[in-house]
């Protein structure tokens, strides 16, 4: 988009000079000087406690009238988004890049997720009073800058006209842990946002962070010490270790049910099938749909593309080795502009938003955008598949079954998870096949059970959230569980579709732990699969892989039943897990089908 935008700055005109005497026409092309937005550096925005935040403000060249103001509120240093600011300043908006408290050139100290709500309120109201603003203020951004929009909204600044949160992180859901399981990435992110500078090179050094994660993993160290292992001891990291569940510490950072009920402004939520913050984005969306007024919900639109985290702002045709059609690459700058025009300038609603939910279907050579009035109305059939086996389901060659009729018999499937084993993690570090990889399934080392459907008789659209219900018994009081679903193409190639995780002690509630009673058969419901939309090809099969994760990418559970972040190899207990699927214990996978 940048290249197109630069070309667009030059206006080429042809001047016709008519000579009456010679009747000759001469064409001349004169390139006009590029129209560059005006910029104000080091603008100081006062907060209620006296701290001053730093902003860089971009305005349309020689701005002639007050306009709506867009701002990005970021810990990643405002300069990172200069290209966006230039774009919107060229399209009729004032744009402010604002460093959050304690980052960049802003005063104060940065503590993630703590100050942005009230600070953001003050930013909105200060911008609204500036002579270049017409009283309407909005926000742009994703990830942390998506979270910012929701936390500012819960303060209800009078001049906030709309928000467009993309890939919005949700404290207590997908950050700093995901469903109560931490990972080394949180320390990488804390290093990225340490001090006042960008730290982009260090943050992006995959070799360094991979080596540190592997060191923690191979040496069986306590996760609570990972910040020291990584070289950046962090008080925030330690505070998070003391808050391992979604409690009041995280609740105060996000809207409450009462807050959702008072929302009135238009909202456009953006996420992707492979967005790491998809759980957060959907948590905000679903809670607004649950608690919001009917009028407000009519003004909340949702876009779900075949995108990863970065793709929710700059879509690409390829993600993790999968390639998508040209239509998947939306011009999100253009869409944002149209949305802002509609919400703040009285323009037309973006033509792309034909209904309140837009999602992109991939697969089976028939990709396209589709629409629905609500998230729930996308699918019109639930297909229930029953897990079964002859007692052997530990490999892709001797797997269990997923069938629409429950298989006869009462065989069980068993696997073993030894937290002292490091072969899976060591192999994972060399795996660069992304969403097409089968390494973890093919080399599960006896840790997991695998089930396949029969080949699909016709191409079938599966869109939405899967639900897995399984009955397990184990000989440890806690372990971690993961369920992954793949499409296995007729060629034998694999495509990752969705996954879900669970720490066994939180099987009944994410807020309260209940250790497992060893030897007792209990129900485990995985209802936190990520959203996806795929047309499964004729001849393809679905594969379900249930196992205990053993990876450098997550905090390791040593199965002792103690505080997981404090466990080391000395606490390790091998887990023997049994999956039961008989008439009294129906283990099922539910698929949302679109017909």
Language model features with spans:
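Cap/lid segment of the alpha/beta-hydrolase catalytic domain
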Residues: 60-129, 313-324, 445, 477, ...
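Accessory cap/linker subdomain of secreted extracellular hydrolases
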Residues: 90, 154-262
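Glycine/threonine-rich phosphate-binding loop and adjacent beta-strand/alpha-helix elements that clamp
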Residues: 30, 296, 325, 331-332, ...
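Active-site-adjacent alpha-helix of alpha/beta-hydrolase-fold enzymes
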Residues: 279-300
């Amino acid at each position: 988009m940048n290249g197109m935008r630069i070309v667009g700055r030059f206006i080429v005109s042809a001047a016709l000079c008519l000579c009456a005497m010679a009747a000759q026409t001469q064409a001349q092309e004169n390139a006009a000087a590029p129209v560059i937005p005006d910029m104000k550096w080091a603008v100081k925005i006062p907060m209620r406690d006296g701290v001053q935040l730093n902003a860089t403000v971009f305005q349309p060249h020689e701005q002639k009238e007050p306009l709506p103001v867009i701002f990005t509120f970021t810990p990643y240093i405002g300069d990172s988004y200069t290209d966006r600011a230039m774009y919107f300043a060229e399209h009729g908006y004032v744009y402010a890049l604002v460093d959050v408290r304690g980052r960049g050139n802003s005063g104060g100290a940065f503590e993630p997720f703590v100050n942005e709500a009230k600070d953001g309120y003050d930013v909105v109201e200060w911008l609204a009073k500036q002579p270049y603003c017409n009283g309407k203020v909005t926000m742009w951004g994703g990830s942390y800058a998506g979270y910012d929009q929701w936390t500012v909204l819960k303060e209800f600044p009078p001049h906030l006209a709309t928000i467009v949160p993309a890939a919005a992180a949700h404290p207590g859901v997908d950050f700093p842990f995901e469903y109560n399981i931490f990972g080394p990435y949180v320390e990488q992110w804390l290093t990225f946002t340490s001090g006042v500078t960008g730290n982009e090179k260090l943050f992006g050094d995959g070799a360094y962070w991979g080596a540190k994660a592997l060191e923690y993993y191979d040496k069986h160290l306590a996760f609570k010490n990972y910040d020291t292992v990584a070289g950046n001891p962090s008080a925030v990291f330690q505070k998070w270790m003391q808050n391992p569940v979604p409690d009041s510490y995280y609740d105060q950072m996000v809207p409450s049910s009462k807050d959702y009920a008072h929302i009135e402004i238009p909202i456009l939520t953006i996420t992707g099938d492979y967005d790491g913050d998809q759980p957060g984005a959907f948590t905000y969306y679903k809670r607004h749909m649950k608690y919001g007024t009917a009028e407000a919900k009519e003004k909340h639109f949702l876009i779900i593309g075949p995108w990863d985290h970065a793709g929710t702002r700059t879509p690409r045709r390829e993600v993790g080795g999968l390639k998508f059609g040209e239509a998947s690459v939306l011009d999100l700058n253009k869409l944002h502009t149209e949305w802002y025009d509609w919400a703040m300038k009285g323009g037309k609603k973006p033509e792309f938003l034909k209904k309140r939910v837009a999602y992109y279907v991939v697969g089976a050579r028939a990709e396209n955008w589709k629409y629905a009035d609500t998230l729930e109305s996308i699918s019109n059939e639930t297909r229930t598949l029953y897990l079964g086996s002859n007692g052997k389901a530990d490999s892709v060659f001797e797997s269990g079954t997923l069938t629409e009729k429950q298989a006869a018999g009462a065989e069980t499937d068993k696997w073993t998870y030894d937290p002292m084993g490091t072969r899976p993690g060591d192999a994972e570090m060399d795996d660069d096949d992304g969403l097409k990889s089968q390494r973890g399934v093919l080399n599960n080392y006896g840790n997991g059970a695998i089930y396949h459907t029969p080949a699909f008789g016709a191409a079938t659209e599966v869109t939405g959230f899967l639900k897995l219900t399984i009955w397990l018994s184990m000989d440890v009081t806690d372990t971690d569980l993961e369920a992954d679903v793949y499409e296995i193409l007729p060629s034998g190639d694999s495509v990752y579709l969705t996954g879900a995780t669970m720490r066994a002690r939180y099987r009944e509630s994410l807020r309260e732990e209940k250790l497992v009673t060893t030897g007792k058969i209990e129900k485990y419901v995985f209802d936190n699969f990520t959203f996806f939309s795929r047309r499964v090809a004729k001849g393809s099969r679905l594969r379900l892989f249930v196992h205990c994760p053993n990876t450098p990418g997550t905090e390791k559970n040593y199965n002792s039943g103690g505080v997981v972040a404090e466990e080391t190899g000395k606490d390790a207990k091998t887990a023997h897990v049994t999956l039961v699927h008989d008439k009294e214990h129906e283990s099922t996978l539910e698929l949302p089908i679109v017909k």
